[in-house]
C-alpha cells in the first residue's frame, strides 16, 4: 500500500469568485487571497455597486494598495449588472482591460443585491452585446420570489431563467457560480462549452445538517444556502470526476463577528485563510487528488481564455489549527473552520 503524499505541488491557483469588501475590511482580508492566488475574480457588490469603468479602476487600486509587498496578485474586476446599465460602458471597460466579466445578481438574492436585475428581459441588450464580445456572464443562480422555498431557489432558477436565457443566447459564456444542488451539477455537466461552474469549499464539505443540527452555526450560513447531503455528494462527485468546466471559486465573503452572531445574521463564509487546504482534503477523501491541480489552476484559465499562472504553490500534510478569530479594526472576523484542525496547509 502506497503511503499518502506529504506534499502537493500545484501550479499557482486562481480564485474565480471572491468578495474583498472595502475600507478596513478590505485591508484585513486581501492578504489572505493575494498570498495564495495569482488572480481573483472580484465581486462588484459593494454598498455602492461597481457599475462604471471609473469605479472599477478606483476599486482595483484600493485592492492593489492592500496587497502586501512580495505578493504577485492581479484582481480581475467585474461589472455589476443593473436594469439601467449602459452596454457601451461595459464594452469600453472590457476593451480597456478593466472588466473581465459581468455579474448578474437577481434583485435581493444576497448581500448588497438590491440594485440587481429585476428580469433578464430588462438587460437583454447588454447580454446580447456580451455574447457578441465574448464577455463572460457570472450568475448568482437563484430566484427570489417570496413563494419559492429557499432550498428550491437554485433548481427553479435553472428552469425559469438559466435555460431560457441560454436557449436564446446560445454563444453567451456563462459561469453558474457557487452551485449547490445535484440539479445544477447535472445541468452544467450536460451543458456545452459555453457553460461552467464554480464550487465553494463549504458546499463540498458540509450540508444543511452541519449548519442546523445541535444548534445553529451562523458561520456556515451562506447564500446559496447549504442543501441536503444528496446535493453535497453530487458536487463532490462532479469535482472528483475530473470534469473540466468546474473550477475553484471560494465565494469568500467576510462579515464582522457581530454581523454574523446576531438574531438576523448576514450570509457568507470567510474561507480565504483555509480554502485551498479544504479543497485538498475533499479531493483526497474522494481519491481524486489527480484532478486537484486542474480544478484549482487549469480549468478556470481555460474557460476564461487566460494564460495559466507560472508560479507554484505547495501544500503540506501538517495539521494546523485555524484561528478562532482575526482582528478587524474595532471588531473581529471568525474564519471558516475557526478553531478546527485541518490536515493540509499552504507552505509559507
Swiss-Prot record:
Zn(2+) 1 binds at residues 17, 19, 103, 251. The active site is at residue 251. GO terms for molecular function: dihydroorotase activity; zinc ion binding. GO terms for cellular component: cytoplasm; cytosol. Zn(2+) 2 binds at residues 103, 140, 178. The modification N6-carboxylysine is found at residue 103. One of its GO terms (biological process) is pyrimidine nucleotide biosynthetic process. Its EC number is 3.5.2.3. Binds 2 Zn(2+) ions per subunit. Keywords: Hydrolase, Metal-binding, Pyrimidine biosynthesis, Zinc. Gene3D superfamilies: Metal-dependent hydrolases (3.20.20.140). It catalyses: (S)-dihydroorotate + H2O = N-carbamoyl-L-aspartate + H(+). Pathway: Pyrimidine metabolism; UMP biosynthesis via de novo pathway; (S)-dihydroorotate from bicarbonate: step 3/3. Coiled coil: none annotated. Belongs to the metallo-dependent hydrolases superfamily. DHOase family. Class II DHOase subfamily. Catalyzes the reversible cyclization of carbamoyl aspartate to dihydroorotate. Homodimer. This is Dihydroorotase. It comes from Salmonella typhimurium (strain LT2 / SGSC1412 / ATCC 700720).
Amino acid at each position: 500500500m502506497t503511503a499518502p503524499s506529504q506534499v502537493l505541488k500545484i501550479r499557482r491557483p486562481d480564485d474565480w469568485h471572491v468578495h474583498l469588501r472595502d475600507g478596513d475590511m478590505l485591508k484585513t482580508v486581501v492578504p489572505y487571497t493575494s498570498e495564495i492566488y495569482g488572480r481573483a475574480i472580484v465581486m462588484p457588490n459593494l454598498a455602492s455597486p461597481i457599475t462604471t469603468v471609473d469605479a472599477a479602476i478606483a476599486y482595483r487600486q484600493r485592492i492593489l494598495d492592500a496587497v502586501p509587498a512580495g505578493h504577485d496578485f492581479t484582481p480581475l474586476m467585474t461589472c455589476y449588472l443593473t436594469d439601467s446599465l449602459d452596454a457601451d460602458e461595459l464594452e469600453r471597460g472590457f476593451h480597456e482591460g478593466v472588466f473581465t466579466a459581468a455579474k448578474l445578481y437577481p434583485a435581493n438574492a444576497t448581500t448588497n443585491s438590491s440594485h440587481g436585475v429585476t428580469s433578464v428581459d430588462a438587460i437583454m441588450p447588454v447580454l446580447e452585446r456580451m455574447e457578441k464580445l465574448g464577455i463572460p456572464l457570472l450568475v448568482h443562480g437563484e430566484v427570489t420570489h417570496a413563494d419559492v422555498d429557499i432550498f428550491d431557489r437554485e433548481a427553479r432558477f435553472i428552469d425559469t431563467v438559466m435555460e431560457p436565457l441560454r436557449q436564446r443566447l446560445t454563444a453567451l459564456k456563462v459561469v453558474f457560480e457557487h452551485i449547490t444542488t445535484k440539479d445544477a451539477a447535472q445541468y452544467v455537466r450536460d451543458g456545452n462549452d459555453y457553460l461552467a461552474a464554480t464550487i465553494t469549499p463549504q458546499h463540498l464539505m458540509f450540508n444543511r445538517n452541519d449548519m442546523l443540527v445541535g444548534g445553529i452555526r451562523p458561520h456556515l450560513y451562506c447564500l446559496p444556502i447549504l442543501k441536503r447531503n444528496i446535493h453535497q455528494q453530487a458536487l463532490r462527485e462532479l469535482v472528483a470526476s475530473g470534469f473540466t468546466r468546474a473550477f475553484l471559486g471560494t465565494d469568500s465573503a467576510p462579515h464582522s463577528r457581530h454581523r454574523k452572531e446576531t438574531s438576523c445574521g448576514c450570509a457568507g463564509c470567510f474561507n480565504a485563510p483555509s480554502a485551498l487546504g479544504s479543497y485538498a482534503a475533499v479531493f483526497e477523501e474522494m481519491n481524486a487528488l489527480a484532478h486537484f491541480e486542474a480544478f484549482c489552476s487549469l480549468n478556470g484559465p481555460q474557460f476564461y481564455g487566460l494564460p495559466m499562472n507560472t508560479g507554484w504553490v505547495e501544500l503540506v500534510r501538517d495539521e494546523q489549527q485555524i484561528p478562532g478569530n482575526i482582528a478587524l479594526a474595532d471588531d473581529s472576523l471568525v474564519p471558516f473552520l475557526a478553531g478546527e484542525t485541518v490536515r493540509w496547509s499552504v507552505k509559507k
